[in-house]
């Protein structure tokens, strides 16, 4: 019994240039990987210093409110109230000075 010869599928030919859709001046210079690197790895800015781009920061943060300073003040207030309640519930420790 003879092994079957592999059949080769003919490749589809790309359409001629006159059928291609018109592109803008910027699109003809950049292809898909270029846009990827421009978007995710900027050459300068905050992402260069700490290693996270703006897109990564937006994707991986769990805070949806942009007012970080307001959130910090509110969190400090809640923490101080919680500590005050805990101190009131616990008896004062005896020290040697009194």
Swiss-Prot record:
Pfam families listed in its UniProt record: Phospho_p8
Positions with biased composition (Low complexity): 1-11
Family indicated by similarity: Belongs to the NUPR family.
Highest taxon listed in the record's lineage: Eukaryota
Region (Disordered): 1-24, 78-98
UniProt entry tagged with the keyword Transcription: yes
UniProt main location, coarse: nucleus
InterPro entries per the UniProt record, alphabetical: NUPR1-like
Sorted UniProt keywords: Cell cycle, Growth arrest, Nucleus, Repressor, Transcription, Transcription regulation
Function: Acts as a transcriptional repressor by inhibiting gene expression at the NUPR1 promoter in a p53/TP53-dependent manner in cancer cells. Involved in the G1 cell cycle arrest, and in a decrease in cell viability and cell proliferation. Plays a role as a negative regulator of the protumoral factor NUPR1.
An individual GO BP term: negative regulation of cell population proliferation
Name assigned to this protein: Nuclear protein 2
GO CC, alphabetical: nucleus
Subcellular location: Nucleus
Skewed-composition ranges (Basic residues): 81-98
